[in-house]
Amino acid sequence: YTLFSAQDDPDRYRSVFNEVRNSIYLYKTTFGFYHIYSFLPDTQLGAFEGLYFLSLKDFSMFDLSETQLKTPGTSSIWSYQKDIRLPFVLSDKETGSDVITCCRLLKNQTTKEPEYAYAILLNPGKFSDLLSETFQDDRITSYLISEDGTIMAHTSRELCGSVLSEEKRSLLLNRTESIFTQDRMHYHTIQP
């Protein structure tokens, strides 16, 4: 939004662009995010910067469903992405990393066309560690799943990226009560 408010004055825009890029880097390093991308229209100065700013066309790298793209609503879109590679300048690793993405796609209210988007990429291992530390009893399993049933974080890191069975996914997502017992297992679900 800050960039859009400065686009009529090229000198001010360049200054604001650098401030936003520095802020993104600060957030990334302060909070230990894997990476942060901001997606701009092709006509916007900086849309092809390639490190922190990409074209809106590049937003497709996250393989989001048509429904998520057509009606993003006011909520963030969470998903699990495999093999995301950072630009070589930021990481010289030959292989990509699996990440949890938190995306927002903002559309023009009149035209319904995307105006800009951003994605915060998170390390699933950090979430898994937090879940493991939540309970001392190792018989308690905690996990975060995406809408499609992909395990984004789990008390057992090895399960990150695997997919719940349709039966288990349905059990967790379609119950009206958040605390229930089934087959001698106790469940407490929290949905967005």
Residue spans for each PLM region:
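Extracellular/periplasmic ligand-binding regions of membrane signal-transduction receptors
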Residues: 1-18, 37-46, 50-51
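Solvent-exposed, extracytoplasmic
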Residues: 17-28, 115-159
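A short local loop/turn or secondary-structure capping micro-motif enriched for an aromatic residue
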Residues: 54-58, 125-126, 159-163
